[in-house]
Amino acid sequence: MSLFPSLTLLLLSVVATSYSETVTCEDSQKICPAVIACNSPGINGFPGKDGRDGTKGEKGEPGQGLRGLQGPPGKLGPPGNPGSSGSPGPKGQKGDPGESPDCESSLAASERKALQTEMARIKKWLTFSLGRQVGNKFFLTNGEMMTFDKVKALCAEFQASVATPRNAAENRAIQNLIKEEAFLGITDENTEGEFVDLTGNKLTYTNWNDGEPNNAGSNEDCVLLLKNGKWNDIPCSSSHLALCEFPI
């Protein structure tokens, strides 16, 4: 066996090993097209170590994060300026006819006149049946007998006062009205012998019976109208006809 072929193969093997890191398969084929055949690539190796940090990059665009929950309402702001007037609204419906003041005044006057007429009729009925009218006074009795204090209370209840004649005409009207002796609104309870009306005013008209007032029994502080129209002082605790006068 010749040594030359073996030596040739050994030399080629050494050359292939020396250039295995830098010579590609294509280069090898160019150098030794007839001898060296390329194998298939091997499997990938393990990842290498991390390299050094690179230089700082440029600032990126703002990101879009997740939208948060709605916060609580803020404080009320100051009132705004008044707004401009709005446009006129639609025309309303036609209203009911109004009442004329002249008609109301005329109606009130008519009603007042009718009421006055009715009151005049009532006064005439009362005058005819129970009382007497003299001037602007109306004298009225209920026909009951009672003490002087009760007569005062009865008359006051009807906003009247105990009958007090101020002249002969009024005294005569009361005399014609009563069928029994009646109390008059005259006393000397405050000062003995000084008879005054129930408002404390001195009398300007009197019609005492002969010998009166005499204060018989020392307690005759009230005045009685006798059937003959004369006056007599009597005790206020006695009971006599109630007689009131009403201003009209």
From Swiss-Prot:
Pfam families: Collagen, Lectin_C. It comes from the Eukaryota. It is found in: Secreted. Residues 43-111 are annotated as: Disordered. Its main location: secreted. Residues 1-20 form the signal peptide. Calcium-dependent lectin involved in innate immune defense. Binds mannose, fucose and N-acetylglucosamine on different microorganisms and activates the lectin complement pathway. Binds to late apoptotic cells, as well as to apoptotic blebs and to necrotic cells, but not to early apoptotic cells, facilitating their uptake by macrophages. This is Mannose-binding protein C. The gene is MBL2.
